[in-house]
């Protein structure tokens, strides 16, 4: 890949029968929406007393916003919700501060969550109705989130863009409360069905010193560490993953190499609903009930990985 291309706001991965565009300002609309994702409940928190954030946190990277939703490109290394030692420096605290700066209520409703080490798109609802409708889209398979992962080992490229299915239950690791494990027969305590789709976009040759692959993934269920555990179960753990990647595997990442790359969903209000609310109609008169496609530009570690490895 041309280095000048990587330094621009977008770059393309060209493969046989593939043309993957990584764009910093990719927002597009269409009339239909199809997907396969069943997720967890809306995470709703009121951070009125916590609507201040550390001056050391990066500025919010807003991908898209209107009166009902806010889409953020979350950096790696920031937790989604406050807890323990991250009481006031979570992404939700930042969002609460942003809402307050706009004169809005500081109740934060995230549609799903991302692990601390995971970068990429995270969606927030600005009101209860939007939150409920967006969550329903996840549960009914209308919305679709696509991830990119850099994994250890050579994997044959799927030149035809085909997806492979991993359908193996996951359960809490009985020996390590921080980890999840595969529960092949589903008998471990806390076992839950988990299903992941993946397609290999690019791979090194199998004979290089430290083979690696770039994989695109979609979730049909939303379990803790699902992508990390499923890929590790195939013998291809995420590079940089201190929980599931063997220490002797060479990796260029200082965190688990996972990026929430793309998100497709429907705007939560219809044209008629928007028209009845002048606040909403300012934003939804053309795009209501349309599918919106968002893309989070790749972080520097992914760009460097691609440029160096491929």
Report the location of each language-model feature.
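RNA pseudouridine synthases
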Residues: 1-310
């Amino acid at each position: 890949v041309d280095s000048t291309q990587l330094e621009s706001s977008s770059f393309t991965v060209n493969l046989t029968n593939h043309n993957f565009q990584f764009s910093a300002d990719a927002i597009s609309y269409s009339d239909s929406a199809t997907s396969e994702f069943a997720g967890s409940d809306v995470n709703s928190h009121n951070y009125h007393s916590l609507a201040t954030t550390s001056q050391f946190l990066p500025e919010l990277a807003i991908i898209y916003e209107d009166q009902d939703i806010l889409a953020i490109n979350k950096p790696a290394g920031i937790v989604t919700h406050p807890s323990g030692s991250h009481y006031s420096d979570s992404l939700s605290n930042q969002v609460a501060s942003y809402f307050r700066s706009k004169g809005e209520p500081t109740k934060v409703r995230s549609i799903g969550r991302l692990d601390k080490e995971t970068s990429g798109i995270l969606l927030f609802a600005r009101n209860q109705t939007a939150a409920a409708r967006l969550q329903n889209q996840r549960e009914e398979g209308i919305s679709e989130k696509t991830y990119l992962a850099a994994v250890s080992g050579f994997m044959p490229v799927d030149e035809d863009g085909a997806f492979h299915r991993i359908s193996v239950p996951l359960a809490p690791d009985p020996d390590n409360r921080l980890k999840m494990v595969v529960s092949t027969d589903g008998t471990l305590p806390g076992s839950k069905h988990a299903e992941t789709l993946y397609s290999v976009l690019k791979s090194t040759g199998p004979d290089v010193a430290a083979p690696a692959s770039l994989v695109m993934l979609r979730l049909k269920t939303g379990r803790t560490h699902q992508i990390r555990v499923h890929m590790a179960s195939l013998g291809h753990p995420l590079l940089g993953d201190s929980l599931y990647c063997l220490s002797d595997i060479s990796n260029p990442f200082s965190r688990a190499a996972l990026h929430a790359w793309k998100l497709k969903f429907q705007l939560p209000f219809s044209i008629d609903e928007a028209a009845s609310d002048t606040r909403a109609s300012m934003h939804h008169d053309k795009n209501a009930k349309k599918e919106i496609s968002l893309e989070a530009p790749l972080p520097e570690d992914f760009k460097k990985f691609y440029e160096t490895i491929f």
